Amino acid sequence: MAIFIDITEWNEIRYFNTKGTRNKCVVRNPLNDELYFFKTSIQKDQKDYKTEFWSEIIASEIGNALGFNVLKYDIALHGNEIGCISKSMIGNEETLVEGISLLTGYDNTYTPESKDSYSEYTFQFIKKALNNFDLDSFVDDIIKVIIFDSIISNSDRHQENWAFIAKHME
């Protein structure tokens, strides 16, 4: 069950940059020094989707109830903004490799920002890229993501919102 956390006094890490359409920031819990991601709802074309962040919380609760390996999301207050918060899924020695890096590394002609490439973004394409990098053991995880997205009616699984955790290398 999601809990409410006031993170107003937590330290915002301004040098972290996260992708996506929503306003978000990275904060550090002063009690345990762990990083968390705080997301608010989006405001678009003079429309305010104030309750949009709840979809993250509800998806998290459904995923956990069904036994999927999903992040836990809670409700958070950051100053005068309400949103959702999740603990960082990576440790200090790890980094996220987004799907877009994997796919463009496999096929450098693939241009996800071009509408002409939309039809190329398929399970088969992802599977070929995984096989190319000897990551075929993750095919079952991709299938689980597709099943979970179907259950929660997520139609926004683009290349920048799935990733692999890798050891950080300089």
Task: Indicate residue ranges for each PLM-predicted region.
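Catalytic activation segment of kinase domains across protein kinase-like and atypical kinase folds
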Residues: H158-E170
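Residues in Ca2+-coordinating acidic/glycine-rich loops
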Residues: S153
